[in-house]
Amino acid sequence: MKHDHFVVQSPDKPAQQLLLLFHGVGDNPVAMGEIGSWFAPLFPDALVVSVGGAEPSGNPAGRQWFSVQGITEDNRQARVDAIMPTFIETVRYWQKQSGVGANATALIGFSQGAIMALESIKAEPGLASRVIAFNGRYASLPETASTATTIHLIHGGEDPVIDLAHAVAAQEALISAGGDVTLDIVEDLGHAIDNRSMQFALDHL
């Protein structure tokens, strides 16, 4: 399967866990791989891969899963849905390559990468056992949820790009649907990942 990716860690013996990272619009898998390097030492038996978006973003080295040009609350879900089969296929490709099942797979995303990770579990329940969504949101809130996947929402309290209210609404929707979810708010943080965000993520994994 041909897609942009950067292998952060590949264990010598068969992998016991699979950690897949997904970047934001205009970023690339190598840059997001730096986030993966925080997880790798704590999970020496994990295959850790940073996956690039499916299409170029206009920025020379940047990738994206869907365009944000002219995006609205009304058309966001359709854009996510259009590329979702490719996203799910990518996750399944790495599960097959690693020999790791969904029960030991974690999807870790920032911004648009977090949107895709969250939406993938909505589209394909049980695709992974954990999602860590840094400064993400749902395109539209889930009406059903499964405890087969634990969702960890980590969000900057001062995010000007994806308002904290989206994470709060996601938590409330998942709880109402009977899902397994946590929300950690990083005070005074904008649309970014910092050491505090990472510590929340590491504590959950």
Language-model segments: which ranges?
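Alpha/beta-hydrolase fold active-site loops
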Residues: 17, 149-150
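Serine-hydrolase catalytic machinery in alpha/beta-hydrolase-like enzymes
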Residues: 2-104
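Gly/Ala-rich beta-loop-alpha elbow adjacent to hydrolase catalytic centers
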Residues: 108-113, 117
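Active-site signature of alpha/beta-hydrolase-fold catalytic machinery across serine-
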Residues: 34, 119-123
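A conserved short beta-strand
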Residues: 126-138
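C-terminal catalytic histidine-bearing segment of alpha/beta-hydrolase fold enzymes
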Residues: 165-205
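Short beta-strand/loop motif that positions the catalytic acidic residue
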Residues: 152-159
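Conserved alpha/beta-hydrolase "acid-adjacent" motif
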Residues: 30-31, 160-166
